[in-house]
Regions:
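Acidic, metal/ion-coordinating pockets
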Residues: 1-196
């Protein structure tokens, strides 16, 4: 399913994708409660993606079972990920996600604005946008002295070509705390890029 862009993805120094679907098993579903077949993960791997972001508004579409199954399949596939975890102990061991590539050490963070009204149930963890948690994660990342801290934020409003006030304010705050790069997802359209 990635045949038309596989070459570009596989040639990237680091290919990060937003896994905005669960791998929750049958029955497979589309909008508004997504669940993809397991073969989708193999297609992602074959396309050359290195990292998947899992904190997004669809990560709980198949509930606790779907999220845990997705994590289990990601773990068995060898594709690294950030954003959702089976429990707090697993999150502490794996997060922030550190990547060493071409002589650079990168700390990767991932958060979502929400999960479409479905709450994560204990002991599962979804990285929601929460300044206290994010600040702790940034401090944890800084302690390991990365060359860059990238925050991948699932935020904003769908089909809006400009970031809203809340996105801009949070972006400013993230940069003030030491994040060096911010990548956004969720709007389903391309929003502007800004260099500071």
């Amino acid at each position: 399913c990635f045949s038309l862009i596989k070459e570009q993805i596989s040639q990237a120094d680091l290919a990060i994708g937003n896994l905005e679907v669960t791998l929750g098993g049958r029955p497979y579903r589309g909008y508004p409660m997504f669940s993809a077949p397991d073969e989708y993960l193999q297609a992602i791997k074959d396309a050359g993606f290195d990292i998947l972001l899992t904190a997004n508004n669809h990560c709980l579409d198949r509930g606790k079972k779907g999220m845990e199954r997705t994590i289990q399949l990601l773990d068995s596939s060898g594709i690294r990920y950030a954003g959702t975890y089976k429990n707090l102990s697993e999150r502490r061991q794996r997060y922030p996600l550190f990547i060493n590539r071409n002589g650079f050490r990168i700390a990767l963070l991932n958060y979502t604005y929400g999960t479409n009204g479905i709450k994560a149930t204990s002991p599962n963890i979804v990285n929601y946008i929460d300044k206290n948690t994010i600040l702790q994660d940034i401090q944890s990342a800084k302690a390991r002295q990365p060359d860059a801290i990238i925050a991948c934020m699932h935020w904003g409003e769908e089909y809006q070509s400009l970031p809203n006030r809340e996105q801009r304010e949070l972006a400013n705050w993230l940069l003030q705390q030491g994040v060096t790069h911010i990548i956004g997802s969720h709007p389903h359209v391309i929003q502007p890029m800004e260099l500071r």
